[in-house]
Regions:
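Conserved acetyl-CoA-binding loop-helix of GNAT-fold acetyltransferases
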Residues: 78-89, 202, 208-224, 242-247
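Conserved active-site tyrosine of GNAT-family acetyltransferases
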Residues: 107-108, 245, 250
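Flexible, substrate/cofactor-facing loop regions flanked by secondary structure
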Residues: 128-195
Length: 279
């Protein structure tokens, strides 16, 4: 544990127990859904985390999934503590950062966002879910791996693996022998009782027919059989998608921002810390 030089009352802890980090993220379990899943015992060795403490209590935390090449990182907490967390707690050259709106400027003191997406985290529970499956949907597993890669593109080959399709929930719609729409869970946590739906995609020629609604509904329905909360992410300006998810019973929980960020040069970080400039 090291004392932060600019904020002596905040300490950066690089070795906090996973249980302590989980307890902190549980304060907003819906927003921290992905991080909670990454703290499950079967996933915990794929990630690392660092926290900011004040008077011994965690006031901010960040978690990075190291096994994924795009380096997804989630962070939440008090603004000043987040700023110190990214200044002193990590030196990663590039991250995909997701954080509540208050974290944006704090993180920008050390990282420059190349793009910022304004997002909603939505949630549905069994009591509010309204299934809408109007097409024949097929549960997808390892045997359908090549079909999924054909839909999502060859770049997805490193993401979609037999183990992932065995672990997660995926449904698709076929036209003949070709898959034309699919959706699935990004992560699931039985320990936290939460699942995150995503990767909703329909081939261009088949859009506007409600296929995305059908596959999202099928994934959500099965996820709710095993998890109390099911969440998803959607861009705030994607009104059609928000409408689809709302009809399924999803509600907006909270906004957040997300985007690729690169670490600022030392002189740039010093300039921002001294003068508060943004770019």
């Amino acid at each position: 544990m090291t004392a932060a030089p600019l904020l002596p009352d905040i300490e950066i802890d690089l070795a906090a127990p996973a249980a302590d980090v989980r307890a902190f993220f549980e304060r907003d379990r819906l927003l921290a859904a992905y991080a909670l899943a990454d703290l499950d015992p079967e996933n915990v060795d794929r990630s690392r985390w660092w926290v900011a403490r004040q008077d011994g209590d965690i006031v901010a935390a960040a978690l990075l999934v190291e096994v994924l090449p795009f380096r997804p990182c989630f962070a939440m907490g008090e603004t000043a503590a987040l700023a110190e967390l990214f200044r002193s707690g990590t030196s990663e050259a590039r991250l995909i950062v997701a954080t509540p709106p208050n974290g944006r400027l704090a993180i920008e003191a050390s990282y420059r966002f190349e793009r910022i997406d304004q997002m909603h985290r939505m949630v549905v529970r069994a009591g509010s879910f309204r299934p809408r499956v109007s097409h024949t949907v097929t549960r997808l597993g390892p045997d359908e791996l090549d079909d999924l890669i054909d839909l999502y593109g060859n770049a997805s080959r490193s993401y979609f693996t037999p183990a992932r399709l065995e672990r997660e929930i995926y449904f698709g719609v076929y036209a003949g022998r070709q898959i034309v729409a699919a959706a699935g869970t990004h992560v699931r946590s039985r320990a936290a009782g939460i699942a995150a739906v995503g990767n909703v995609l329909t081939r261009l020629a088949y859009r506007g027919r409600g296929l995305a609604t059908s596959v999202t509904s099928a994934v959500t329905e099965l996820a709710l059989e095993e998890h109390g909360d099911v969440v998803l992410n959607v861009r705030q300006d994607n009104a059609p998608a928000v409408s689809v998810y709302t009809r399924l019973g999803y509600e907006i929980h909270a906004p957040f921002v997300e985007g690729p960020a690169i670490r600022r040069a030392v002189w740039e970080r010093l300039t921002k810390n001294l003068f508060g400039r943004t770019s």
